[in-house]
């Protein structure tokens, strides 16, 4: 079983939304063999997801309310087969710690919705979803 990790900054908006969308998308389409998680490069462990992230995911029929943020650790890196980054900056930072060929930039970069309106979070969710097919194709190449 492959393990992928969605990574953003605080692990309260983009990466938990991506994890929720990925899990729902793979469940609906019967895609097996790839588990997912999420973490943040500057996360405060135990933080709840952003209210608007929870709200927008609920609109999609996805419940991320129980999610709690976690920081990216060396142990987590060791357990991960591939890392899905939300920005070029995340990818560049991780390239110093993790094999570059196992780093993937989702949707050519996903803008941070933190502090934004519900509509900002909706656009973020759409952008994340738009990158899922490309991610799956990439994952199947290794």
PLM regions and their residue ranges:
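Alpha-helix C-terminal capping/helix-to-coil transition sites in glycosyltransferase folds
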Residues: 78-79
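Conserved active-site segments centered on acidic
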Residues: 1-75, 137-142
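Phosphate-binding/catalytic loops
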Residues: 82, 86-142
